[in-house]
């Protein structure tokens, strides 16, 4: 299987604070990579560099056939093209409150990609059905639960037809009872062959869905491999310590 995403030597600092140190990994097309690690380990920053929401200071990131060397000057057009390769789902769903669910989902395709409105609407209805919210198309975000809003956020990211889906702790802000609905949608996407990178605290979910797990600590990829290795027989003491604390908190 060819790699859809390759990350080579990514570095990132905020002021004096170095957040990512020489981060490199590959994500084969049609696979799911889970990124785990303690708070402040750089997980979210890694994800944000993949969408250039945070621009890496150096390193090369390739998505599909578009390769960007962040040590060089990157022009705006290239950066925009790079950003459109991936769809991002945040911890909080960031929906536009004054727009209906349907309007939220068609906004990107119509405004950014200049797609015909009727085509975007048909696509949006199909995506809302996929995330189990077809009947909520004309409601406003405040009328939905947090979990439903998050699923609209997923539909909105899918609407731009990205090559790669990025999830930043998509369930961390949700009521525990609603977590399952969102995870089910992500699992369905995995079964449909979407290529995804998911930052998550849901270790059991990572075990079920991920093909590869990266353990990040202090901005370094300390360990990576299939979930059955990283999550059940980690080689690094730090990975073991982290997993013990998460799986047996008391």
What are these regions (language model features)?
Residues 3-227:
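ABC family nucleotide-binding domain
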Residues 228-250:
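C-terminal boundary and immediately downstream tail of ABC-type ATPase nucleotide-binding domains
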């Amino acid at each position: 299987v060819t790699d859809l995403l390759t990350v080579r030597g990514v570095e990132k600092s905020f002021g004096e604070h170095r957040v990512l140190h020489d981060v490199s990994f590959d994500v084969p097309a049609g696979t799911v990579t889970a990124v785990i690690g303690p708070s402040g380990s750089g997980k979210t920053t890694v994800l944000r560099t993949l969408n250039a929401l945070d621009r890496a200071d150096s390193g090369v990131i390739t998505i599909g056939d578009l390769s960007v060397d962040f040590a060089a000057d990157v022009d705006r057009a290239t950066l925009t093209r790079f950003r459109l390769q991936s769809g991002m789902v945040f911890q909080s769903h960031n929906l536009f409150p004054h727009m209906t669910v349907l309007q939220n989902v068609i906004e990107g395709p119509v405004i950014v990609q200049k797609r015909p409105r009727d085509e975007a609407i048909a696509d949006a209805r199909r995506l809302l059905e996929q995330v189990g919210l077809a009947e909520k198309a004309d409601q406003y975000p405040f009328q939905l639960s947090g979990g439903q809003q998050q699923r609209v956020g997923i539909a909105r990211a899918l609407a731009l037809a990205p090559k790669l889906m990025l999830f930043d702790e998509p369930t961390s802000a949700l009521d525990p009872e609603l977590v399952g609905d969102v995870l089910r949608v992500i699992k369905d996407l995995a079964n449909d062959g979407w290529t995804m990178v998911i930052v998550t605290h849901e270790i059991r979910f990572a075990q079920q869905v991920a093909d590869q797990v990266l353990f990040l600590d202090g901005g370094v990829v300390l360990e990576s491999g299939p979930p059955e290795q990283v999550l059940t027989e980690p080689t690094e003491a730090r990975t073991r310590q982290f997993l013990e604390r998460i799986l047996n908190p008391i």
